[in-house]
């Protein structure tokens, strides 16, 4: 299932440079000397796990119920910024760099949501964690959804941030058209963006950046519809977007309704609320700065701590 990949927001050459710089500005105060999106200063040193033929980079922060954080396309786990220590106050946060991203080198296999979801499941097995909460942003939201679909017994709750369920109607039309232009051919034009700078700072093989763009571009060109998989999830979901995201708020409301949300008054005792989903629309947040927005950690933390 090629789903949610378009949510990466890496659209046209001009749009990439302009919008990604917004994300760098929004989290600049949290960065260390490794460059934009390098994460909060004093971050714990990471480790590598051999899973499915890939050396998967991960970090563990805090203690408590395990929470896996999955980053967006061309980013790394560190792009969650100060939301990492905020969530680690009450959770054992497992921060992962997905295939070909951050400190995890690419391997000779297609970059698919299914394969990356299986990597996460294998990592949890290796860490002897039978069940965890999984929170994904953009591309990471697609991976998180796949973990819930393919390994339902390993997921207690899901948090999907800025994650479209389908290409048709999931994005503003002009963005969908631009997304199909991503390829390694735009690598030089990415120089100066926070994603390029982060990759150059931490990637094991810096020469692979055009290859990463090619792989992401390949599946971004495909139309997708993950509605049926979203409906069939056996785990409760918090669906979160910004009110100025690359997808219209109506898409989030539609997703909420698919999980029995927004269909009745919740009642004084809350008995009428959906047991399958909650919806959060973060005010003033765009697709490019929501990942490090402190409200995200507050809303997600509250949701995850509910029975």
Residue ranges of model-derived segments:
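Alpha/beta-hydrolase fold catalytic core
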Residues: 2-4, 10-11, 18-67, 90-91, ...
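Conserved HGGG/HGGXW glycine-rich cap/lid loop of the alpha/beta-hydrolase fold
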Residues: 54-105
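Conserved loop-alpha-helix segment in the C-terminal half of the alpha/beta-hydrolase fold
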Residues: 85, 243-285
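Active-site loop/oxyanion-hole signature of alpha/beta-hydrolase fold enzymes
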Residues: 95-135
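Flexible "cap/lid" loop of the alpha/beta hydrolase fold
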Residues: 142-150, 156-196
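Active-site nucleophile elbow and catalytic-triad environment of alpha/beta-hydrolase enzymes
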Residues: 213-229
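Short beta-strand/loop motif that positions the catalytic acidic residue
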Residues: 233, 239-241
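Catalytic active-site module of serine/aspartate enzymes centered on a nucleophile-bearing elbow/loop
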Residues: 271-307
């Amino acid at each position: 299932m090629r789903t949610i990949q378009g949510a990466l927001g890496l659209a046209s050459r001009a749009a990439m440079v302009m919008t990604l710089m917004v994300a760098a500005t929004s989290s600049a105060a949290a960065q260390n000397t490794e460059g934009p999106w390098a994460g909060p200063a004093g971050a714990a040193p990471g480790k590598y796990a051999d899973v499915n033929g890939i050396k998967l980079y991960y970090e563990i922060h805090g203690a408590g119920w395990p929470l896996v954080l999955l980053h967006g396309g061309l980013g790394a786990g560190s792009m969650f910024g100060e939301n990492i220590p905020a969530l680690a106050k009450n959770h054992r946060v497992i921060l992962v760099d997905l295939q070909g991203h951050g400190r995890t080198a690419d391997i000779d296999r297609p970059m698919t949501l299914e394969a990356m979801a299986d990597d996460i499941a294998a990592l949890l097995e290796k860490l002897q964690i039978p069940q965890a909460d999984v929170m994904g942003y953009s591309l990471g939201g697609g991976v998180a959804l796949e973990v819930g679909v393919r390994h339902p017994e390993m997921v207690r709750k899901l948090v999907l941030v800025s994650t479209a369920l389908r290409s048709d109607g999931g994005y503003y039309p002009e963005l969908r058209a631009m997304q199909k232009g991503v390829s390694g051919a735009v690598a030089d034009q990415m120089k100066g963006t926070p994603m390029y700078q982060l990759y150059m700072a931490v990637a094991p093989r810096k020469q692979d950046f055009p290859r990463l763009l090619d792989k992401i571009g390949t599946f971004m060109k495909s139309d997708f519809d993950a509605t049926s998989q979203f409906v069939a999830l056996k785990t409760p979901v918090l669906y979160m977007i910004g009110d100025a995201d690359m997808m219209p708020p109506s898409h989030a409301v539609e997703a909420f309704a698919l999980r029995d949300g927004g269909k009745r008054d919740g009642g004084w005792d809350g008995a009428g609320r959906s047991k399958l989903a909650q919806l959060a629309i973060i005010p003033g947040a765009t697709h490019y700065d929501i990942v490090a927005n402190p409200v995200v950690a507050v809303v997600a933390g509250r949701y995850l701590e509910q029975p």
